[in-house]
């Protein structure tokens, strides 16, 4: 929210403070896992742009991984734990703008394709919420209009699950789906892709 509101000084101050606190873990070889694409983008790219001379920020940036990216890397290098099972329904997967901005490919889709026999529909468009912008009363209807193509595509897939790496985008898509005609029921909640993987493990 501070970045969206243009408070770059506070964002830079936070970057320096957090990066300094995380440096011992980074130096110990720990990966820093971001659960949402916006956080990963901030740590990887936006903080280094705001404080380019700070070595702690540079180190944190290099150590940061999006959680889906991290799981895919583990699957490729070490393999995943046994026990993945097919799901009881298909998944409409939204790829958030901040995932695409990281230039790491469709890591959430790649991760979900590790699930046996998965029926996966990938939606690669803006959901319309725009961070905190789309949840305000004055912008909400406009945000729904922007996200209508995504909501329509998600509704037309008639998949049991809707997933997005961005919690705000997932909730926004469901709100849009409620306004789009369709025979299949709208899911009660949107899941993070990692939650879908957990379901496939029976968790």
Provide a role label for each language-model segment.
Residues 1-203:
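Iron-sulfur cluster-binding electron-transfer modules in prokaryotic oxidoreductases
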């Amino acid at each position: 929210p501070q970045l969206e509101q243009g408070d770059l000084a506070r964002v830079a101050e936070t970057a320096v403070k957090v990066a300094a606190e995380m440096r011992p873990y980074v130096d110990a070889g720990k990966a820093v896992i971001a659960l949402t694409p916006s956080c990963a983008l901030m740590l990887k790219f936006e903080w280094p742009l705001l404080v380019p001379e700070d070595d702690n920020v540079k180190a944190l940036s290099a150590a940061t991984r999006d959680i889906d990216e991290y799981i895919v890397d583990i699957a490729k290098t070490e393999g995943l734990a046994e026990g993945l099972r097919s799901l009881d329904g298909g998944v409409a997967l939204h790829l958030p703008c901040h995932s695409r901005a990281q230039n790491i490919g469709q890591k959430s889709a790649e991760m979900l394709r590790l699930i046996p026999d998965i029926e996966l529909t990938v939606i690669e468009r803006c959901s319309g919420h725009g961070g905190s912008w789309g949840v305000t009363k004055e912008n909400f209807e406009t945000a729904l209009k922007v996200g209508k193509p995504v909501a329509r595509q998600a509704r037309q897939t008639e998949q049991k699950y809707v997933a997005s790496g961005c919690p705000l985008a997932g909730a926004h898509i469901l709100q849009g789906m409620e306004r789009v005609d369709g025979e299949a029921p709208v899911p009660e909640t949107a899941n993070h892709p990692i939650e879908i993987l957990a379901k496939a493990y029976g968790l």
